[in-house]
Every structure is written in C-alpha cells, then in structure tokens.
C-alpha cells in the first residue's frame, strides 16, 4: 500500500467570522488504512497565540515545516505573510524541503494562509480554508453555515463543520481540537 494515503489523512479547518479566527483539527493519525492514534495535536501556536498553524501530511514533515516557519516569523518580526513567502521560497529551492510531504494552514489576526507542498502561499476567499482528506467536506460545511446560519459563532461553525467532515472522511475523527487566534 502506498504511503501517499498519509499525505492527506486529516482535517484542518480555519475560518474567520466577526473578527474571531478559529483553527480546528481532528485527532486521528493514520498510516495506510490503520489508525495509529486518535488524540494527536495537529495545531501549534507561535508568538503567544498570535499565530496558529495546523498541518496535514507526514507528521515529521509538518513539524519540520512548523519549526522553519517559527524561525521565519521571529526573523521577520511576526509578519506572517512575509514569513510564509520566505518559507515558500526556501521550500521550493531547498533540495531537502522539496521532498517534505505536508501542507499547512497558518493564521493571524490579518491573514489566513494555505502553504502547499509545492511551495505555494494561498490566501483563500470567503475567510475559510481547509486541508487534508476531510478538508473539502469541512470547507463546504463551513461555507454553507457561514452563509445561512448567522446566529452561530466561529467556534460553533468550526465544530459543526469538523463533525460533518469526520462523519464522511474515514481518515478523520471526532476528537476535535480548536485554537483561537488572539
């Protein structure tokens, strides 16, 4: 069985509503068709919770990229956009980094960014982004809830969307962890 299944075996969702920014992740770690762990933490904070990152893909690769992003953020005085672009440049040009199999969503008060395995930096539309095998389910649910359920908070939308994704994606579970950008 190919290890490529582990590349997308998770759900990470980030959304902004009424100046509240939430990143959510499921807790399942899979290898092929086997669940290795159900309580993993796929979210990390930088700069006293001012920047939060979630990663999908190889755990070791995701952590390596997170560490490199943290260094860039310190170098560029907590400027997330510039740090992400500089990381993407390194990701594309470095022989070792090009082989990493991970994607990240990072957010601060001003930006939600997707960092792809190709070294792309994408700022999504409509204040919502998702990655991983359950990402499209979570993204669709969040967009629908944001459009039609005006009384829900960002946290409620994230939780409902993640639960829908976990119902549909066999590589995601209902052990949802959420972090709020402060």
UniProtKB/Swiss-Prot annotation:
Give the similarity note. Answer: Belongs to the peptidase T1B family. HslV subfamily.
| Catalytic residue list | 10
Domain of life of the source: Bacteria
Q: Which reaction does it catalyse?
A: ATP-dependent cleavage of peptide bonds with broad specificity
UniProt-listed InterPro entries: ATP-dep_Prtase_HsIV_su, Ntn_hydrolases_N, Proteasome_sua/b, Proteasome_suB-type
Its annotated compartments are: Cytoplasm
Which Gene3D superfamilies does the record cross-reference, listed alphabetically? Answer: Glutamine Phosphoribosylpyrophosphate, subunit 1, domain 1
* Record-given protein name: ATP-dependent protease subunit HslV
Broad class of the protein's primary localization: cytoplasm
Amino-acid positions noted as binding Na(+) in the UniProt annotation, renumbered to this chain: 166, 169, 172
User: What's a GO biological-process term for it?
Assistant: proteolysis involved in protein catabolic process
Q: How does it assemble?
A: A double ring-shaped homohexamer of HslV is capped on each side by a ring-shaped HslU homohexamer. The assembly of the HslU/HslV complex is dependent on binding of ATP.
Tell me which species this is from: Rickettsia peacockii (strain Rustic)
Pfam families tied to this protein:
Proteasome
Explain the regulation of its activity.
Allosterically activated by HslU binding.
- Please provide one cellular component term from the Gene Ontology annotations of this protein: HslUV protease complex
Q: Does the keyword Plastid apply?
A: no
